């Protein structure tokens, strides 16, 4: 087992990994930028190393500084968390070259599944259902035109190196294809340094349902049930739940089998997520695979009583998995609390937290790195907390979430707590009747000024 793990991340996920390491008797090293000197992950780790100024490119994305921090502290493994370098094949390879275990996917696996067109071709070979469209990179606009006609409108153009909704364009008519092709490629080039595109049939108003998988060094994989991540804004998830209110036992079995087939076909090692689009007829199609821990992993942990970070560490240390597939016995919901103003177009709201009162009670979990007196830097993602409720039924989990959101007080900055509180009362949400288009019609009501 590892003696010391460096966490190449910040915020709540760094703290989350530190907590599991402490329980496992593993020493921890936090890395931080000068903007994060007062963050809780720095205070809770056994050692902490400053790796640069606030800009991510000079700190959390600066591979040489992170490797140097691992070497001077004698860390024998690095946990990348999510975001930053978690799906960076080059970083995974450099860790390998320095005899430091990367607690994540191998460089080859990241390359294979990180390139969306490659991943789709791999899944077709594995016999996993995929959205109709191109089977690889589109070589030029002429091929794009031909493919769109064959696939049938509407189509979705996607950046092969994409993520976070960048380089994606929905095209409903042939006359709009050229503009979409040009703008998607430009956006992709600017964001990823790569303008390769592929095309898929646009699945209208789908559910976004992902399956959590774990694979080990023996080539065996299992699934830990689904998460419904359909409520999104600009392709960014806002809230997630398990089980999905749209799920049936038969569909879970099929999707779980497909996800395990995908993981075993590529001999996947570690925790990963196979993401699917599910249409209104419950046909499901592979979308992508994330070769890292997900932001929303706690809801899976809650319903199957399983520490996914611990499992990541064990698998990285070559401990075989049990191979058992899991079905949720409880219902869990997560609300991502962001430092954003929901009444002002979700504009970021960094600054100093003057008051913080956290909710508590049975079935409430709060993963956060912030506290009263903490200043949220403007340099990073705006998520400051994940509020999770767990209960016997969906109705009870929603009731708990309403109560917890009412109890949750953060002052000094704007947060998305009021948005989530309104969401929990929305009739379509209460009925479990929502798709990825839900936020297009959701109107946030401003409170009446007293």
Language model feature labels by segment:
Residues 7-23, 48-50, 71-73, 96, ...:
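ATP-dependent carboxylate activation and anion-phosphoryl transfer catalytic cores
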Residues 133-134:
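Conserved beta3 strand of the protein kinase N-lobe
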């Amino acid at each position: 087992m590892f003696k010391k793990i460096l966490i190449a991340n910040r915020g709540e996920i760094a703290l989350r990994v530190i907590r599991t390491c402490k329980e496992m008797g593993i020493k921890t090293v936090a890395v931080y930028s000068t903007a994060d000197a007062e963050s809780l992950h720095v205070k809770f780790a056994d050692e902490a190393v400053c790796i640069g100024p606030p800009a991510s490119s000079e700190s959390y994305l600066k591979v040489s500084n992170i490797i140097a921090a691992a070497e001077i502290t004698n860390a024998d493994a690095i946990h990348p968390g999510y975001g930053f370098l978690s799906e960076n094949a080059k970083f995974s390879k450099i860790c390998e070259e320095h005899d430091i275990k990367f607690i994540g996917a191998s460089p080859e696996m990241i390359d294979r599944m990180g390139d969306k067109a490659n991943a789709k071709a791999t899944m077709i070979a594995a016999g996993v259902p995929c959205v109709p469209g191109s089977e690889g990179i589109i070589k030029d606009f002429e091929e794009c035109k031909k493919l769109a006609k064959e696939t049938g409108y509407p189509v979705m153009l996607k950046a092969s190196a994409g993520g976070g909704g960048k380089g994606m364009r929905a095209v409903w008519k042939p006359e709009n294809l050229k503009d979409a092709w040009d703008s998607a490629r430009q956006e992709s080039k600017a964001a990823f340094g790569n303008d390769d595109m592929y095309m898929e049939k646009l699945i209208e108003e789908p559910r976004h349902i992902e399956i959590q998988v774990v694979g080990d060094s023996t080539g065996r994989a299992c699934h830990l049930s689904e998460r419904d991540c359909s409520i999104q804004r600009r392709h960014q998830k806002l809230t997630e739940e398990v089980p999905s209110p749209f799920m049936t036992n038969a569909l879970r079995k099929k999707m779980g089998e497909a996800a395990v087939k995908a993981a075993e076909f590529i001999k996947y090692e570690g925790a990963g997520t196979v993401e699917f689009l599910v249409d209104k007829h419950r046909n499901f199609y592979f979308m992508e695979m994330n070769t890292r821990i997900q932001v929303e992993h706690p809801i899976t942990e809650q319903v199957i009583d399983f520490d996914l970070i611990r499992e990541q560490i064990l698998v990285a240390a070559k401990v075989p998995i049990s191979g058992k597939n899991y079905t949720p016995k409880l219902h869990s919901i997560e609300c991502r609390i962001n430092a954003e103003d929901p009444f002002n177009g979700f504009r970021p709201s960094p600054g100093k937290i003057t008051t913080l009162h956290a909710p508590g009670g049975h079935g409430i979990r709060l993963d956060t790195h912030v506290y009263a007196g903490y200043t949220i830097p403007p340099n990073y993602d705006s998520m400051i907390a994940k509020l999770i409720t767990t209960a016997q039924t969906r109705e009870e989990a929603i009731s708990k979430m309403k109560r917890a959101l009412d109890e949750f007080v953060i002052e000094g900055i704007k947060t998305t707590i009021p948005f989530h509180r309104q969401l929990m009362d929305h009739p379509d949400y209460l009925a479990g009747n929502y798709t990825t288009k839900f936020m297009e019609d959701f109107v946030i009501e401003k409170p009446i000024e007293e």
